[in-house]
Amino acid sequence: MTLAASETLRPHEECVPVPDAFDAGLWFIGRIRTPWAQRAECPRRGDPVNGPDCRIVLDARWLSALEGVAGKDRMQVLYWMHLSRRDVVRQNPFFGDGSLGTFALRSPLRPNPIASSLVRLLRVEGNVLTVRGLDCIDGTPLVDLKPEFGLLP
């Protein structure tokens, strides 16, 4: 049992067995530094205007991949919600009294707990990006960075 699997389910929630093996691999390319130590402290949605400054610390090997990023205003940040359960298929959201399928929600409980936030880029200093608009716990693994969809280099 993993740490996340020990969480108590809400009424009307359902789990399934997860596969024994993964279909693909990925590398975490850095870590996200935020003011929140626990999921309960995180906002439900990041605020790119009034949210706190957060830092994305990219592994030094990927430094050259930041070329051209400093000129961007907004970035899409993809990250791995590493403490989330991966076996929940029906959930009882905080705003309702009944269950919905996981794919109908933006909950962190997902088979592949990938999250996406559109953030405001404040500055780039070496391998550290300072941004606003994140909603994850401190130390969350970084999966990828992309410019806002629709913007060309």
Task: Describe each model-derived feature in a short phrase.
Residues 1-118, 122-153:
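Glycine-rich, low-complexity intrinsically disordered segments
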